[in-house]
Amino acid sequence: MSDDTKSPHEETHGLNRRGFLGASALTGAAALVGASALGSAVVGREARAAGKGERSKAEVAPGELDEYYGFWSGGHSGEVRVLGVPSMRELMRIPVFNVDSATGWGLTNESKRVLGDSARFLNGDCHHPHISMTDGKYDGKYLFINDKANSRVARIRLDVMKCDRIVTIPNVQAIHGLRLQKVPHTRYVFCNAEFIIPHPNDGSTFDLSGDNAFTLYNAIDAETMEVAWQVIVDGNLDNTDMDYSGRFAASTCYNSEKAVDLGGMMRNERDWVVVFDIPRIEAEIKAKRFVTLGDSKVPVVDGRRKDGKDSPVTRYIPVPKNPHGLNTSPDGKYFIANGKLSPTCTMIAIERLGDLFAGKLADPRDVVVGEPELGLGPLHTTFDGRGNAYTTLFIDSQLVKWNLADAVRAYKGEKVDYIRQKLDVQYQPGHNHATLCETSEADGKWIVVLSKFSKDRFLPTGPLHPENDQLIDISGEEMKLVHDGPTFAEPHDCILARRDQIKTRKIWDRKDPFFAETVKRAEKDGIDLMKDNKVIREGNKVRVYMVSMAPSFGLTEFKVKQGDEVTVTITNLDEIEDVTHGFVMVNHGVCMEISPQQTSSITFVADKPGVHWYYCSWFCHALHMEMCGRMLVEKA
């Protein structure tokens, strides 16, 4: 259907579904954009869905495996989800910042050690999952994820798909954008703190306009998961990315005004991309030219402009107002800043940044080599490795394919159409990711577009709707939509890796550090975790040790006193993959997973006298129902 043709619904009611969504978005932003996007599209406005034969490329037959792993942020569910691509089948959920009843994450002693002091928070808001790299390629060792809600960053071991470290970032609020050092390997995890706060933030002032109100750019040591350094910036920080040399990182800023309301944050016609020179930051720290803030010992370097002069470690590149996504092209040539309130994307030539820092360029805008007009509400850009970029247009509800080289030519004044195609998506897309797109191996096979609204695409589920993650075939010249995938609240982003890049364990290693502290506790008690079924009392603290082998626990009953603090430690002796056991103490809020060769423990108070049954919560055997026992609690 062309734009000029009205549907019967439009004739009757004035607006169709797409028109309503577009009008709603434009109400809040069109006046701020100030210009319509130009450029032609190869296909029309209506979604180009793949035919049946083409859709079969995304079908994975029963018993067959997907070509890619996909790791989805779980948004404010606080978890990470693992999907197979292209089937879009959910394979696993990895609890991170949330409490998970199925596995006992947030309840077990092992998970509480990982959560540390932040275990007091029962929520999280995951946005940006990223896989560790070596030489610009995924090495499959770790996945890192941010928590915007409680200013944390977590690391997930991909061999066992479990979170093993969490760090709370000091001196900041709301960790949002997160990216990794790509070469020579992931030594740093870079993350943006979004909101400006006063320093010290102790209630002595609420003024955010002065020099003592700011936010910081943060670098985390990927191995120790300790904050290595921080950089004070002008304005705020949104999204970030790293180059392929290890020297430059860049972040978008949408609040250069340091405003506290919507109108104020959109006042300036230009905001900026701030570029960080990583070796220069390290040199400043080595030379002791840093401060610390509050009780934190993290080195803090000042990256703000002073008296019109740049700092040694940062440069600020003006771009159209309120930019959002920041993406590095897989050839290492460009940082792409997505306009959001401008219909443009700004292409920053990474090779010119050295001259910018050296003072050889008169204007920081001299590093800009392209600024294509793409459509309304460009948010994020991904790449196919063949010289094309794909940008989500939130207001237009489209994915636009455009050519990087042609956009550069157009910026120089040539009459060239850089737009290859526009594809309707459903509806209001945010992040998008192509297969291997954040590495030098981008292969241009699939794109996942994470659309924020599903509206009428699925069976109704009441007032709360799922989001819609759409799979698009980009292997040919034309983009083709092949799959709609409903997702629960609220994935922001995903990352896609080849299945051969992720090496998982089938059963636990008995020497695994995940439960090493629990093993040490048992050794101190003289317990052999592979055979002993014993109860150790130390005052009112009782430690219950048992083994399990489907379909039985090593102890079918144990006795404690009312008010005792009870720690149950179980070791699963099964050596066959997928024979996971569980432990639930009825009416005590106690549940945990014990996978093959794993040791798990959980602590609770036996506050009710009487007989209390426990059972295996995972169906591990035909006699699963009989796998149970009793805690006998003597009245105090």
UniProtKB/Swiss-Prot annotation:
Gene3D superfamilies: Cupredoxins - blue copper proteins, YVTN repeat-like/Quinoprotein amine dehydrogenase. The gene is nosZ. It catalyses: N2 + 2 Fe(III)-[cytochrome c] + H2O = nitrous oxide + 2 Fe(II)-[cytochrome c] + 2 H(+). Cu cation Z1 binds at residues 324, 380. PANTHER family: CYTOCHROME C OXIDASE SUBUNIT II (PTHR42838), NITROUS-OXIDE REDUCTASE (PTHR42838:SF2). Its EC number is 1.7.2.4. Cu cation Z3 binds at residues 128, 431. Cu cation A1 binds at residues 581, 616, 620, 627. This is Nitrous-oxide reductase. It comes from Pseudomonas aeruginosa (strain ATCC 15692 / DSM 22644 / CIP 104116 / JCM 14847 / LMG 12228 / 1C / PRS 101 / PAO1).
